Amino acid sequence: MRLHRLRARLSAVACGLLLLLVRGQGQDSASPIRTTHTGQVLGSLVHVKGANAGVQTFLGIPFAKPPLGPLRFAPPEPPESWSGVRDGTTHPAMCLQDLTAVESEFLSQFNMTFPSDSMSEDCLYLSIYTPAHSHEGSNLPVMVWIHGGALVFGMASLYDGSMLAALENVVVVIIQYRLGVLGFFSTGDKHATGNWGYLDQVAALRWVQQNIAHFGGNPDRVTIFGESAGGTSVSSLVVSPISQGLFHGAIMESGVALLPGLIASSADVISTVVANLSACDQVDSEALVGCLRGKSKEEILAINKPFKMIPGVVDGVFLPRHPQELLASADFQPVPSIVGVNNNEFGWLIPKVMRIYDTQKEMDREASQAALQKMLTLLMLPPTFGDLLREEYIGDNGDPQTLQAQFQEMMADSMFVIPALQVAHFQCSRAPVYFYEFQHQPSWLKNIRPPHMKADHGDELPFVFRSFFGGNYIKFTEEEEQLSRKMMKYWANFARNGNPNGEGLPHWPLFDQEEQYLQLNLQPAVGRALKAHRLQFWKKALPQKIQELEEPEERHTEL
């Protein structure tokens, strides 16, 4: 009897020690373990420069089944369970994509290459960065990052959430989603409705709702944020009926759901292009999908190569109607949002990566016309649209430097500034909206880019994450360091409270009837009515001129 009691006591002690060990690993251990609904994950403890707290990282956690075989061009399915402890110490494979243009036109300027991750169709993973002290019950705000890349490239390993997590005491989640043809091909019918990449994002957010408490996060305080096509994704999630309730705030950096070239009402154009590129010349959409499912990784990469960007579609599921209609609908219920742009969005990165024009050469009228034609094709806009834009932005000007600045403003307004302002106007009467214009050119880029540059597309990212391309440390000036800390606090305060303002920060007013916005520069200031005269052109003059041009054509057709 005594022996039985002794064994029971020893067993209880052993269980207690094991429980303490697991709890220790879950918090301060160099080899932390956390539990998800599909199994345990081993992470790493990272010591963050400039922060008192360490951060635990859990990389490459599956949030869906690998989208292979019959799951290619199909909605994501829940992940399968695993036994034992899964290794979460290395980045996941990136989704299939063509990296040639980005590496040759952009990263080469910094003598850098992409992180040496493998590339695979099996890529539906997310990574988590959580303060080392966090535990289930910490209820920390959660910030889910959606990367940009024109919906054709990008990866989780390009971003490091450690600094944001450590300095602002938040849980950062970075997700991957299918890209290019695998992510957004559609036949426009039941055989391939499309928007697979967007559905992946929804699946990742559902996973966060189920599991983030195990990593110290609060599932009732989730903010989604993204840049460029990531901002478009965030904005699209805000209007989509199937993602409601999965997040509670949204930050759209240089990209919204109305960005031309990233949304199409019809799948016809992309479907036809893909059919031609793939040599799947079947007229029947079911046969076309079957043919594409049989293509190898190398063949899919070859089909992807010509796409510099690819649009989502009105699929009846994720987007039951065009985002503009959803934004204007009476039943639209947005979440509090930060919406913003940079003041030189088309200055350097996009023209280089998309090879629109030579950024090192002076631009004459002929070069501007050729560049405009390339952009109209990419953005799927009619030639008459381009003529009206040239008339408004460029006129008869022939001075090369002025011409280039006018062309850059025209394209930045078309793609980013005007759509962002339109979304802000749609949302601000129904939920709080905070608008910003980022204006600072990073000091470390001044020797690489033309001297007239301001804040280019993506320039705000190192200030939000306090790192550059996969965690590379940046040498900020002291003033830039202060700007970065302000921006991190604004973003994290918004994730905590739905309001970016806080102690020690310059006041950021709501975007409302007065159209006030924050100018994010070394000395932040409040501005008012950004691009007011251009917005009037886009809202009133341009639609009226297009209608006037279309009316004679309609009369001619009737005759």
Curated annotation (Swiss-Prot):
Keywords: Disulfide bond, Endoplasmic reticulum, Glycoprotein, Hydrolase, Lipid metabolism, Pyrrolidone carboxylic acid, Serine esterase, Signal
PTM-bearing positions, type Pyrrolidone carboxylic acid: Q27
Positions of the catalytic residues: S228 (acyl-ester intermediate), E345 (charge relay system), H457 (charge relay system)
Organs and tissues of expression: Preferentially expressed in intestine with moderate expression in liver. Within the intestine, highest expression is found in small intestine with lower expression in colon and rectum.
Cysteine disulfide partners in this protein: C95-C123, C280-C291
Stored Gene3D superfamilies: alpha/beta hydrolase
Catalytic activity entry: cocaine + H2O = ecgonine methyl ester + benzoate + H(+); a carboxylic ester + H2O = an alcohol + a carboxylate + H(+); 4-methylumbelliferyl acetate + H2O = 4-methylumbelliferone + acetate + H(+); 2-(5Z,8Z,11Z,14Z-eicosatetraenoyl)-glycerol + H2O = glycerol + (5Z,8Z,11Z,14Z)-eicosatetraenoate + H(+)
Similarity field: Belongs to the type-B carboxylesterase/lipase family.
Protein task: Involved in the detoxification of xenobiotics and in the activation of ester and amide prodrugs. Shows high catalytic efficiency for hydrolysis of cocaine, 4-methylumbelliferyl acetate, heroin and 6-monoacetylmorphine. Hydrolyzes aspirin, substrates with large alcohol group and small acyl group and endogenous lipids such as triacylglycerol. Converts monoacylglycerides to free fatty acids and glycerol. Hydrolyzes of 2-arachidonoylglycerol and prostaglandins.
UniProt name for this protein: Cocaine esterase
Organism encoding this protein: Homo sapiens (Human)
